[in-house]
């Protein structure tokens, strides 16, 4: 089988290539460059997966394994599909998840179809901690990995169902410690390389700092849910639902961001009780499994949140209304909601709003 391995220069993708080569597959390594070389060189001190050193690491590992290494410069595609979306969502007072969108529109689903055409691959493999398996009940699906601490299925919930047959995630059967041990055993230089922890195009900046450089300061009011004005902010794009720190106001007791009104440039804050709700609206769901087959459904509204049992999902004129069996804290417009039956990823969508 001819397999392309998406390569960032880190230990995960390096071991992915190694495992596939050991299994006897025809392996090529492919690296997507999303940023200009100049930008990456200026910010090489930050732990992001784009620098010239990362590309060099990828090339060294490919040479060590005796496989070809191709580099694609997709700066414009990445900007139009991910960065522009990121900026527009924040302008609307929402909190997007650029990594989930990138997996769908650029480096996983879209890239697999592109490589199928230009390189005649059978599969695209990445270093994601997830599994793609044939499930007796649901068919071909993504499942949670062995290493639950590294579980990346949430970020894959927007990948199109038709792209799953082109993808494979070999690391789903390993823990991170086992992956590093394999790299060490085979003498790969990247065995102890640090993981990339940041949104790559932010280059070490916070979202607020990055967006201020594009949008400038946009001062507006901070209001309590009661209507009382408590202070001013320098841009609603600096805040997300549930945020407490950095508000710069004094109220006598803790208050959190409850809502963001981008039209009036107003930040709404209130006590923690206002963060809880049991319903959300999703305009569209990306189905890995048809809705009528879903059973024992739980939903995860942020990457580090635990899944919460779902009571029902109703199709409405506005989209899909999701009703939880209990109140959920911090439902955030723009974030991804991923749906599961146990370990099986059923699908996902982008939260439109919290519904009272």
From Swiss-Prot:
ATP binds at residues 6-13, 32, 127. Its main location: cytoplasm. The record marks 128, 335 as: Interaction with tRNA. It is an enzyme of class 2 (transferase). It catalyses: S-sulfanyl-L-cysteinyl-[protein] + uridine(34) in tRNA + AH2 + ATP = 2-thiouridine(34) in tRNA + L-cysteinyl-[protein] + A + AMP + diphosphate + H(+). It is found in: Cytoplasm. This is tRNA-specific 2-thiouridylase MnmA.
């Amino acid at each position: 089988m001819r397999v392309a391995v998406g390569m960032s220069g880190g230990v995960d993708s390096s071991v992915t290539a190694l495992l596939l080569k050991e299994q006897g597959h025809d392996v090529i390594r492919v690296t997507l460059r999303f940023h200009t070389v100049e930008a990456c060189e200026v910010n090489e001190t930050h732990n992001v997966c784009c620098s010239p050193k990362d590309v060099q690491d990828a090339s060294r590992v490919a040479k060590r394994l005796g496989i070809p290494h191709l580099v694609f410069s997709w700066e414009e595609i990445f900007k139009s599909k991910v960065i522009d979306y990121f900026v527009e969502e924040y302008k609307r007072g929402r909190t997007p998840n650029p990594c989930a969108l990138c997996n769908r529109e650029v480096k996983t689903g879209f890239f697999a179809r592109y490589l199928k055409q230009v390189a005649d691959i059978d599969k695209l493999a990445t270093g994601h901690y997830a599994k793609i398996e044939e499930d007796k009940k649901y068919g071909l699906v993504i499942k949670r990995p062995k290493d639950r601490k590294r579980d990346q299925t949430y970020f894959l919930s927007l990948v199109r169902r038709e792209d799953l047959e082109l993808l494979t995630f070999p690391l789903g059967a390993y823990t991170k410690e086992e992956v590093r041990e394999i790299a060490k055993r085979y003498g790969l230089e990247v065995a102890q390389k640090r993981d990339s922890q940041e949104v790559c195009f932010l280059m070490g900046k916070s979202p607020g700092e990055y967006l201020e450089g594009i949008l400038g300061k946009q001062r507006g009011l901070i209001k309590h849910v009661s209507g009382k004005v408590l202070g001013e902010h320098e841009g609603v794009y600096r805040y997300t639902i549930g945020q407490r720190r950095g508000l710069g106001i004094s109220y006598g007791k803790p208050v959190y961001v409850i809502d963001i009104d981008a039209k009036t440039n107003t930040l709404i804050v209130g006590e923690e009780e206002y963060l809880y709700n049991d319903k959300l609206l999703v305009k569209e769901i990306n189905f890995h499994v048809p809705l009528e087959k879903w059973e024992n459904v739980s939903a995860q509204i942020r990457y580090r949140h635990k899944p919460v049992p779902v009571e029902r999902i109703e199709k409405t004129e506005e989209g899909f209304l999701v009703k939880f069996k209990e109140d959920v804290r911090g439902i955030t417009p723009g974030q991804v909601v991923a749906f599961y039956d146990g370990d099986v990823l059923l699908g996902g969508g982008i939260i439109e709003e919290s519904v009272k």
